[in-house]
Amino acid sequence: TALNAQDIAGPSCAPAFSMSRADFLMIRQLMEEKNENGNRVPELSVEFDADTEVIKDQYTYNIVGKIPGTDSDSMILLSAHYDSYFEGFQDDNAAVAMIIGIVRALLRGGYKPRHTIVVCALAAEEWGISDTKYDWSTGAYRQVFEARPEWQGHVIADLNFELPAHAHSTRDAVRCTYEYADFVRSFVDAVQMPEGIYPE
């Protein structure tokens, strides 16, 4: 976990800082140190030195792979974004690795899908566009409406994965559009949780 300035949904000129867990731990240790009288230091000064620049109208690339289905007219997307702040393991490269792992398991198992399975590693999720609260959707939106307009009307579902390696809770969340709510509830109810999936 880190102090993260992502998705500020504001102007590109707004000052924003991110702090790693390692830096937080160092600052906390300094705050817990005691002076010669045995008292904690009441105040700690920290200097932020940030030089950031948002360069607009740059190119990003979505990476796509397919397993052809017997019904070539319909597709199921497995998607995750690969752009990130700092290392990006949790947000969201773990999800990219996961969808690649899903497809690899299907191929190794000889599975022949009915619907074409499309793997999408998307860019422009963290900051796809300035001055809007929908900056996170730019890469996915442009994939369907600009890069692959022929997909419209053929994608029956997009299973998008975000933060799959989160280890600080005893439950996951599934979100969907209201049209899929009944289906998703029945799907979730049918899933059996393996033992030890949420370690203490």
Where are these regions (language model features)?
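Active/binding-pocket-proximal capping segment
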Residues: 84, 117, 176-180
